[in-house]
Amino acid sequence: MVQCLDGVRQLLAVVFKCCDLELKQPRGLEDPQVLARETVFSVSEVEALYELFKKISSAVIDDGLINKEEFQLALFKTSKKESLFADRVFDLFDTKHNGILGFDEFARALSVFHPSAPLDEKIDFSFQLYDLKQQGYIERQEVKQMVVATLAESGMNLSDEIIESIIDKTFEEADTKHDGRIDKEEWRNLVLRHPSLLKNMTLQYLKDITTTFPSFVFHSQVDDT
């Protein structure tokens, strides 16, 4: 009987300990220390980022997850504006490929946009943005799709002739292997020569995430060089 009671006490101790942990750690928030080790965010930044995540995830459906509509709303302040850029970013954030973002996906993916994120991570992510077919290289049509989409989002209207000229110049410089496509190595070399290609890959206000919650907005702009 004594042994039985001891067993019950041990079981209750475990239950209370688990309940205590759940109370201390918000539902949906992975261990901040784990995320801090796997991203460029500090523990306090991870916790602040979670507050931002909760605001975005409750914009349409308060379920603790971000769907594409909420993502669009956070990006462009409207859920109706179609954007190839936003679609690509969402798809790359959605590593589980289930059409929704949990906080772990949100934090890990957003880490690449932090000013302190390694350059190689930014280059790799930007390459994936253009690699629409996920073939490991960028084709001419993919570049055109992104250029046209970026121009439209920026409110700029260029003739097809000028757009084709821009793409011609891009491939003339980037496609050093002359095979009609841009691979990761060629993309990296192009970006290193033209760092402005990565200007959309850095969100300066992520440095101040612990003190303020700025609008989560990517400003898609055309390279002005």
From Swiss-Prot:
Keywords: Membrane, Repeat, Vacuole. SUPFAM superfamilies: EF-hand. GO terms for cellular component: aleurone grain membrane; vacuole. Acts as a calcium sensor. May promote vacuolation of aleurone cells in response to signal induced by gibberellin. CBL proteins interact with CIPK serine-threonine protein kinases. Binding of a CBL protein to the regulatory NAF domain of a CIPK protein lead to the activation of the kinase in a calcium-dependent manner. The keyword Membrane applies. It comes from Oryza sativa subsp. japonica (Rice). The record marks S154 as: Involved in dimerization. Residues 45-80, 81-116, 118-153, 162-197 form the EF-hand domain. This is Calcineurin B-like protein 2. Belongs to the calcineurin regulatory subunit family. GO terms for molecular function: calcium ion binding; kinase binding. It comes from the Eukaryota. One of its GO terms (biological process) is calcium-mediated signaling. Homodimer.
